[in-house]
């Protein structure tokens, strides 16, 4: 039997990029051969084995055949007579369809090295059209390799897949999985650019697609277009290496602007409430994890208040802290401020503009956190008024801070 390193590890080595994961393909072996050599089977749908010492995954060379719609509509054939080229032919992109032998020989039957040099994302063959997840994967690779372009024939094939309804059969969990990975790439806006270009964005994330072409006030948004603004915001979240919940909140914070009545454009009065509703809808459909959903909803609802923090009354700031559970969840509140920072700087010419709201609100939060709510409760004779007394004490603490800014408590 012959063992080859395949896929991303080969690609990244040629690009000079780090890659901690190695995928191995074994040609000329059977499951019995692997077991006899001490490998442990782990694959459910096709033969994958763990190396007895390194615990790396080794997959038998296999082919696949389409049997139905969507991601799960395949049957696999793995046998000793499946060749390396047959295994590589089922892969999505030419740059991922290369292998390296034990002696270092590069196996490149689909000219992946040439496409790396020309910075082209090109599908391997017609089997690409059988798996709609590959549309999402190409878009994700565009976000990772942001200076690569999609080959014209590949883009045409992606458009035909969308037109025939293949993407409509994608399961929610797989869409979210690829979306999350794309948001964590170097330039996530490229993912949405490619999805929009092939028509998949309108089918998978219509709430985001509808933002493009919606105008905003030029004095606050020199980039004008809400869709372009959203792309700038998610790229800001990537540039600052923020967490996935922050990046997802950056994507969804302005969804409500797509439903602003035409007669009040380019103003967007009440878009925060509309954004909350649309974000809830999107999160339910894609089964978004709770941490991402919750931060996205808070950002959609409160980003306007946070931008105006210096103009808010002390009582409004306290209400903001209470509504966002900032005292019990300070780390999440910081993430909320991170998302708002991306929104503020994700505007044409505003990328490096100072943004004072986070420091201002964290100072106010520290002042409120320094209060002893238990002591206030004990001192309150009428127990029904405890929440009211605590709220009033918090308002007073912030008023004192505003009157004496030099005496700001230390932030935790």
Curated annotation (Swiss-Prot):
Co-factor note (free text): Magnesium is required for nucleotidyltransferase activity.
Binding site for CTP: 8, 11, 91, 137, 140
Positions with a binding annotation for ATP: 8, 11, 91, 137, 140
UniProt GO BP: RNA repair; tRNA 3'-terminal CCA addition
Record EC number: 2.7.7.72, 3.1.3.-, 3.1.4.-
Catalytic activity, reaction form: a tRNA precursor + 2 CTP + ATP = a tRNA with a 3' CCA end + 3 diphosphate; a tRNA with a 3' CCA end + 2 CTP + ATP = a tRNA with a 3' CCACCA end + 3 diphosphate
Required cofactor names: Mg(2+); Ni(2+)
Domain HD: from-to ranges: 226-327
This protein's UniProt keywords: ATP-binding, Hydrolase, Magnesium, Metal-binding, Multifunctional enzyme, Nickel, Nucleotide-binding, Nucleotidyltransferase, RNA repair, RNA-binding, Transferase, tRNA processing
Other noteworthy facts: A single active site specifically recognizes both ATP and CTP and is responsible for their addition.
Domain notes: Comprises two domains: an N-terminal domain containing the nucleotidyltransferase activity and a C-terminal HD domain associated with both phosphodiesterase and phosphatase activities.
Protein name as it appears in the record: Multifunctional CCA protein
Lineage summary: Bacteria, Pseudomonadati, Pseudomonadota, Betaproteobacteria, Rhodocyclales
Name of the coding gene: cca
